[in-house]
Amino acid sequence: MSTATPKVGFVSLGCPKATVDSERILTQLRMEGYEIVPTYQDADVVVVNTCGFIDSAKAESLDAIGEAIAENGKVIVTGCMGVAEDSIRDVHPSVLAVTGPQQYEQVVSAVHEVVPPKTEHNPLIDLVPPQGIKLTPRHYAYLKISEGCNHSCSFCIIPSMRGKLVSRPVGDVLSEAERLVKAGVKELLVISQDTSAYGVDMKYKLDFWNGQPVKTRMLELCEALSSMGVWVRLHYVYPYPNVDDVIPLMAAGKLLPYLDIPFQHASPKVLKSMKRPAFEDKTLARIKKWREICPELTIRSTFIVGFPGETEEDFQYLLDWLTEAQLDRVGCFQYSPVEGAPANDLGLEPVPDDVKQERWERFMAHQQAISSARLQAKIGLEMDVLVDEVDGEGAVARSWADAPEIDGSVFIDSTAVKPGDKVRVRIVDADEYDMWGELV
């Protein structure tokens, strides 16, 4: 009978959705008595959760797999890159098993094959917290409400990796949120591939939470989450009419006044080639309406420059749209062909690399001026911030306008706080990304 504690190393790459997948696998392994260790040398086997969205992410995943093989030798691969098993085995033929995303049971079974769980383990020692194993700091957590996507954007292969939209029952989502809040989480980050489509696949089926009926729909989900007394932040939202319904909740202080909306472009021609919603004029009107209802609303977005067929006229249209939209937080990527994406077969003229680089630089300079002006306008305001880190020089916090890892920070010249504290500050300075505040 084996009494030694089996040990697993874990490498998690990619987006927040992949982080949640990793957390679920780790939680199951911990429940079975496995110890999660931080080094290759101490592990009996290493699991690598990969990203396969763009070429640079694939290269990073292959490098991580190679490092794990070199340092440990026993490696199981999962995640989005796992849907193309040959592309992994061609480079690393010695991997023990390959699975795709969301295949939690197959990953755990593969671990069993390499190092079986203890025949007996003490549940008091191997106790897993009610909220499960989390890879984020204790005070915030990702809350995944669905898998997959019903869109067919020509630059994207996510539906081929993660499938069509499958919403989680709202009762399950809210019960998980409750467990997280009881465990000390101060901020819930709602994630999916398309948050505004939540429940469409289930025809907004009625479910139950705490004995009360709740529809599986974005508005009802947000209303219930807003009753939990923590920050609730919405990510991956499409600018559909039903988003209008949640803006009053933000204006009333029940949800963070923050929307993460991946617009990708503004030129109607480019949006059509991307197979994205091409209603940029209606989108501007919608943004204006949202801000009339909720003046504090922060909008973050991502864009692609250099998409095949993009002309200088299209790009200038995008810059003019940014001036009109006055977005707060913006990321920009140069288009990179993705293997298997429909955009490869559109027959459009590729944009030369030097032109893509030049447009990216112009885009960033243009948006930085907008972002800087919007942050400068906050100097002198008082606001609540959530502390993420504290060191000998001070604290790093975030306001309602700042999602972790992707947005800016609020720096506080004080060590009299600790991570997870919500404190009030007065903003005294700002640049294009960050702000500086004093405790009030």
UniProtKB/Swiss-Prot annotation:
Signal peptide: none
Leading EC class: transferase
Residues engaged in binding [4Fe-4S] cluster 2: 149, 153, 156
E.C. designation(s): 2.8.4.4
The Radical SAM core domain, residue ranges: 135-374
Domain TRAM: 376-440
Keywords for the protein's UniProt record, in alphabetical order: 4Fe-4S, Cytoplasm, Iron, Iron-sulfur, Metal-binding, S-adenosyl-L-methionine, Transferase
A GO molecular function held by the record: metal ion binding
Cofactor: [4Fe-4S] cluster
Pfam families hit by this protein: Radical_SAM, TRAM_2, UPF0004
SMART domains, A to Z: Elp3
Gene Ontology biological process: tRNA modification
Binding site for [4Fe-4S] cluster 1: 15, 51, 80
Family: Belongs to the methylthiotransferase family. RimO subfamily.
UniProt cross-references to PANTHER family, sorted A to Z: RIBOSOMAL PROTEIN S12 METHYLTHIOTRANSFERASE RIMO (PTHR43837), RIBOSOMAL PROTEIN US12 METHYLTHIOTRANSFERASE RIMO (PTHR43837:SF1)
Protein's name according to its UniProt entry: Ribosomal protein uS12 methylthiotransferase RimO
Source organism of the structure: Ectopseudomonas mendocina (strain ymp)
